[in-house]
Amino acid sequence: MIGICAQFTCQSGKNAEFEALLSEFVTKVKATEPGAVVYQLCKNEKNGDEYFMLELYANAEALAAHGKTDHMTALVGQIGAYLAAPPKLTQGPAVN
């Protein structure tokens, strides 16, 4: 298994649109990617403009397939309009 934590900082005042965009994306991932074992958007309770996506993939093939989906391509083209900074990604193998 491969885990990823993607951190996002949303532009102030664009939270509702950002959450709607990511919620639709998460729904598509869960519906079409069986190798995405966990895919969940979370919000920082101490800073309402910070979000993180918890991602867990069954294997490297599932992660590679995720990056090639139509919904990922669409998200990459749209998400920048809502971000205050580039996303930060942390990736690594599951320990247990």
Q: Across the structure, where does each feature detected by a protein language model lie?
A:
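Absolute protein N-terminus
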Residues: M1-I2, N96
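Short alpha-helical
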Residues: G13, G48, D70, A74
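Short, well-ordered beta-strand segments in beta-rich or mixed alpha/beta enzyme
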Residues: I2-T9, V38-G67
